[in-house]
Amino acid sequence: MIKEKANALGKAAGGKAVLSYEVTMNRPTLFSVILKAEGDRTVYGGLNLDVSGGKALEDQDLLYTNSAEYAKYLQGKEYVFAENGIRVASAPEGPLDTMVPYTQLVKAINVAEGARLLTSYKLDSAAEDMTLDLKPGELVALYMEANPTSGNQWVLVDQSSQPGFANLGHSFTLPLLNPTGQAGSPGVTILFASFTQPGDYQVKAVYAKTMAAPLRERVFKFKVR
């Protein structure tokens, strides 16, 4: 795929094009590279490759393409993943010289695959009495035992007083076996979050029915710097 892209750029550049490249990300399952062809003119191209699948990444593999952040920064543009953000082409076939930090894109990151791209932390109730040090843009997954058939669900309490906090949604997993013998559907709710700016954060999650007093609550502390 890289060779095909390089050959296409060489033809687009014209003349006796000279090819060069810059690797912007090299992870076990993700490889991104910028190719440059200098001939009668200079043209650029980018590739994002799924190393484990041996194919080019589709936008929706790592991103929510229906998000406002995707539409604002990435839609219709050529881009590659880098360590601190996404490098975007300023013009068709032009240099990928615009850096969009991940802190501006956290709501566009597909949290199910986010660990391939960003540092991610998995926390459970044992983390309540601790303060976790993070960097802006890193992901947090809070694992909470839940049984939605009881009518209760875990939700994050309003964090509008902490403008750097980003609520990235939730998911629920149901184990194949039920070792506890509980009635209903005991499983784990996963609450996803990130932080876009430095600061000290206190995040509260409550387990409750709608419009009812919480049955349980947990507080997690984070120092982002």
Where are the model-predicted features located?
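C-terminal active-site-capping segments
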Residues: 144
